Amino acid sequence: MKLRRAGRLIHLAYQIRRAASAARFHFCYGYSVYLTYLDESGSPGDLNTPFFVLAGVAAFERQTHWLEQELDAIAEPFEQRAGKYLELHAAPMKASKEGWEIFSAAERAQASADVLRVLINTRPRLNVFASVVEQSQMARTADILPHCYEVVASKFDDFLALKYQREKDPQRGLFVLDQKRATEEKAMQSLHKTFKHVGHANGRLRNFAEVPMFADSKSTRLIQLADSIAYWIFRHYSKLDEWGWPQIQPFFASLGNGRTGLHQVLDPATPARLATAQPPAFPFPPAIPKAAQPAAPVQPAVQHPIRTAPGALIIP
């Protein structure tokens, strides 16, 4: 199980570095990459989900390793008991599905809270971007996903431009999305090229390294974090569920002039309805103090197999 996941991680890392290399964004040029992991909640055209959310989290490329480790540490005790790899997807964790059915409601709530708490505990700060659409307010169902992608991409592009304007910090961006449908992947990449080279409603994308990358959510915990963010934003708008929203709201990216990383298309009556939301029946659980870890035993040096023939000339 771990070997298969390691293989997926290696492939994802290769894709990301290949994109950065193709765009010539090496450190020697003074550039580095911000990765925004995105996922969605709700289904365009589904009357049972009146809202659609595309949301995710932006992290500096050198943060992703540590974020993966922190999220792995949340899942590990549950995986040991389940005997298999568990994804940190918010909906199955809440509904007790996809391997989470053997755990109590309190345990699942603690795991869900710990996932969102990654936003609070990470330094430098993580930035959240989201587009929320009330489906009744869009003229065509087919426009919902492209509209959400356009506004999130535009906001992320503005975020990178603002970093340069304020801090003289040249950064480039890359989207990593959950690989769900091949047709959606092709459509998104084509749409991104149009926004970059032709333009969108507010201009052109200027700070992206490449077209978006798509990865199986099993290969990276960061897409699972994006899933949790999208899910709890969706719950806030559709169910007036205030359990996860207060943890996410402070982390919407600041874009200057009062603008944030949150974009909303709502029925005029919806803000008043949201204002009536009540505190959750089951409060957000506090963090569990980490037990002191014993010193790790010294591991013997690994003897790597010799791959060259005896007497081969090796020129490093």
PLM features per residue range, with description:
Residues 2-316:
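Phosphate-ester processing/binding pockets and catalytic centers
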